[in-house]
Structures are given as structure tokens and as C-alpha cells.
From Swiss-Prot:
The keyword RNA-binding does not apply. Capsid protein which self-assembles to form the outer icosahedral capsid with a T=13 symmetry, about 70 nm in diameter and consisting of 780 molecules capsid proteins. InterPro entries: Capsid_hemagglutn, Phytoreo_P8, Virus_capsid_a-hlx_vir. It comes from Rice dwarf virus (isolate Fujian) (RDV). Pfam families: Phytoreo_P8. This is Outer capsid protein P8. GO terms for cellular component: host cell cytoplasm; host cell cytoplasmic vesicle; viral envelope; viral outer capsid.
Length: 421
């Protein structure tokens, strides 16, 4: 089946997003009469006999689901669908990066559709409220802008080898320092704190603070910057928070802003923490000091490498499917388990995925280092595994993910009414 022939039945794919959004439980309200005709056309081309789904939206759907599952698990029957030529035009055998957003369009006419196309994300369902999940694999849903909602800095703090965690540092900062100039960089709700603890006076002058990786992906708006000695409601030992009007001004600079930003004023500041170090010019000698940045923190999309590499931005990758496709597969998975077909179908999907990837390689072969550790219905994790194949061209990896996404969406639609005899 060429892409042109597939476009003749594209109403089915266009209806997928509306189907999975509007269908709930036993309700079936996603497809139109035109979609029924498209379904009939597609099943004819798939050599699947008529399921009679037009006259009854319930029982025939069960038959249709059963036949589709049988079809998808027989690689000799669906082999054409796994080849990259499935998406190729008769006259122009190429696939653009925005194939999904160009041909599988939500029928809800969400005004954000242009944003979806610009972000070039993979998910199709419109989101009622775009928001950031701090503990996800950083493949955002189609309408989730990574910098759309504030984030608490303490949720991003990440301990690494040789570094004490954020909360354990609370007890350490309570303890009087035993030496001069002990630097620290911590986070709490709405605030980032950095400074130097000391048991003796620290002279005025220039001091530099390295911005850790977890903070380098943040920007802050409307921030107050001031001296403090409080961390999570406890008192930091070895710092001086008091100041007088006669004190010389203390300023600091960040890599993304060449201006001297004031400390201890009513000024509201907005700046990015990405790019390197904070350089602070201490105006007056203090026995240690702590500078607080208090404001609304958000993630910088152009600085968060996790957003592009699909690695977790807060912790090791977790089992969170942020495409929501697993929600629509729940009923299907329950039926597979109930009838003892779960392992059989999983093996079939693993073979299907490997066949699909092989078809994109030249010469056809499984790429070196490819190993799936997640189940087939965890689409985001499989996408991350595919996109991590550095020895495969990035555009090819993208096409693999988009191709697998369409097939998974089809299973989400048809598998909902799967009831094996």
C-alpha cells in the first residue's frame, strides 16, 4: 500500500485522536459515517472480511477488534505496514518530519495545532491544561510546553557522587563551620540559596559560584535577591544576614546578562541561571554570607538537554508513559491477561518492532546495541531506546518512532473492544 492509497483512508487515522478522547467505557462516539467508509476501504485493502460494524456500534466492533489483533500479530499479513515505503508517496518517496501533524490531525480543532507543529512533538491528543511533570522521561505531550508552568527548584535538586543531598545539607548548614570559606548551593520552595559559610571575616571582593547542572536549566522571573540566613525555616550557621544603609552595594552577574544585578534592593529581577558561573562582587566584609534568589522558576527549553535527549531531568528514567497511550490500552491489556494471551501478544509486538526497525536500516539489520527493557505498551520508553541509537541517523530514528506511534495508536483504537472467543 503506497502512501497515496493510505491517504484515501486517512479519515480513520484522523479520527484516532478524537476517538480516544471522546470514547469512555462502553460509549462509542468517535467515528463518523465517512470514517466507516474509510474503515471499510482499509479493511478491504488489508484483506480482512467485513465486520459489519456500521449497523451496530458494539458487537461488530468486537469482531473488528479481534480481526485486527489477529492481523497485527501475523507479520506475514502486516509486513507491508512495517516497511518504510508504507508512508512513501508514489511520486515523492520521502517522509517529512511533520508527517504526523500533517496527516493525523485532531478533529477537535484545537487552536494549539500550530504550536504542536512547531514543537514537532509526537503526541496527538489535546491537553486540557498544559503542565510540566517534574519526574517524567521528558518526552512532553504534544501540547505540553516545557516552560509553561512554574517549578520548585528543590524538586530538581539532584545529588551526585561526592555531593550531599539538598535535605541532608539542612543539618550540616545548622552546624557552625570549622573552617573559613565553605561554599554551598542549595534549593528550597521558590528559592535558590548560595553563599559562603565562614568562622572568620570574609573580605569584600569578587567571588565565583559554579551553577550545578540541576540549576543550569532554570530561569527566574520577578525575583527578589537578598541576604538571608534561613534555609527551610532553620538558621544557617556561619553567615551574616544583617546590613546597614551605609554598606557598599553588592552586585552579581550571570552568563546570560552582562548587567550588574543588585543584591538587597526592592528591584524585581529576571534572568537565566544557564551558561556557567555566578560572579558576585561583595561590597562589604562579612563573616560569611548567603544570597537568596526568590521568584518564579521555570525550565528553559533551550537549556534543558533532557528535553532533547529524552533522559530524565530529575532522576533515572521512570516508568511513566507521558503519551497517555497506555491509558487507552488498559482494557486491551486486561483482556489479554484474562485469556492468557499477554505473553504471546508481547512476543508478537517485540517481533513486529524489530521487523519495523530492520526495514529502516540499510542493509536491513537490527542496529547494534538495541535492546528493549520495557514492555511494548510503554511507548515513551521504547521511543527513548530508539532515539538513543547514536549509530543511526537522527532523521531515521525519528521516522522509526513516528511509524511505531501510528501502529500503537491503531492498537489503542481497535484493541478497546478485543474479546477473544
Amino acid at each position: 500500500m503506497s502512501r497515496q492509497m493510505w491517504l484515501d483512508t486517512s479519515a480513520l487515522l484522523e479520527a484516532i485522536s478524537e476517538y480516544v478522547v471522546r470514547c469512555n467505557g462502553d460509549t462509542f462516539s468517535g467515528l463518523t459515517t465517512g470514517d466507516f467508509n474509510a474503515l471499510s476501504n482499509m479493511f478491504t485493502q488489508l484483506s480482512v472480511s467485513s465486520a459489519g460494524y456500521v449497523s451496530d456500534p458494539r458487537v461488530p466492533l468486537q469482531t473488528m477488534s479481534n480481526m485486527f489483533v489477529s492481523f497485527i500479530t501475523s507479520t506475514d499479513r502486516c509486513g507491508y505496514m512495517l516497511g518504510k515505503t508504507w508512508f512513501n508517496s508514489d511520486t515523492k518517496p520521502t517522509v517529512s518530519d511533520d508527517f504526523i501533524t500533517a496527516y493525523i490531525k485532531p478533529r477537535l480543532q484545537v487552536p494549539m495545532s500550530d504550536t504542536v507543529r512547531q514543537l514537532n512533538n509526537l503526541s496527538l491528543q489535546p491537553s486540557a491544561k498544559p503542565k510540566l511533570y517534574e519526574r517524567q522521561n521528558a518526552i512532553m505531550k504534544g501540547l505540553d510546553i516545557p516552560y509553561s508552568e512554574p517549578i520548585e527548584p528543590c524538586k530538581l535538586f539532584r545529588s551526585v557522587a561526592g555531593q550531599t543531598g539538598n535535605i541532608p545539607l539542612m543539618g550540616i548548614l545548622l552546624t557552625p563551620p570549622v573552617a573559613q570559606q565553605q561554599p554551598f548551593f542549595v534549593a528550597e520552595r521558590r528559592r535558590i540559596l548560595f553563599g559562603i559559610r565562614s568562622n572568620a571575616a570574609i573580605p569584600a571582593g569578587a567571588y565565583q559560584f559554579v551553577v550545578p547542572a540541576w540549576a543550569s536549566v532554570l530561569s527566574v522571573t520577578g525575583a527578589y535577591v537578598y541576604f538571608t540566613n534561613s534555609f527551610f525555616g532553620t538558621t544557617i550557621a556561619g553567615v551574616t544576614a544583617t546590613a546597614t544603609a551605609a554598606d557598599a552595594a553588592t552586585t552579581f552577574t550571570v552568563p546570560t546578562d552582562a548587567n550588574n544585578l543588585p543584591v538587597q534592593t526592592d528591584s524585581r529581577l529576571s534572568f537565566s541561571l544557564g551558561g556557567g558561573n555566578i560572579n558576585l562582587e561583595l561590597g562589604v566584609a562579612k563573616t560569611g554570607f548567603c544570597v537568596a534568589i526568590e521568584g518564579e522558576f521555570t525550565i528553559l527549553a533551550n537549556r534543558s538537554q533532557a528535553y532533547y535527549t529524552l533522559n530524565s531531568i530529575t532522576q533515572t528514567p521512570t516508568s511513566i508513559d507521558d503519551f497517555d497511550v497506555s491509558d487507552f490500552l488498559t482494557t486491551f491489556l486486561s483482556q489479554l491477561r484474562a485469556c492468557g494471551q499477554y505473553e504471546i501478544f508481547s512476543d508478537a509486538m517485540d517481533q513486529l518492532t524489530n521487523n519495523l526497525i530492520t526495514n529502516y536500516m540499510d542493509p536491513p539489520a537490527i542496529p547494534a546495541g538495541l535492546a528493549f527493557t520495557s514492555p511494548w505498551f510503554r511507548f515513551s520508553e521504547r521511543a527513548r531506546t530508539i532515539l538513543a541509537l547514536q549509530n543511526v541517523d537522527l532523521n531515521i530514528r525519528k521516522l522509526m518512532v513516528r511509524h511505531l506511534w501510528v501502529i500503537t495508536s491503531l492498537i489503542a483504537v481497535f484493541g478497546r473492544y478485543y474479546r477473544p472467543n
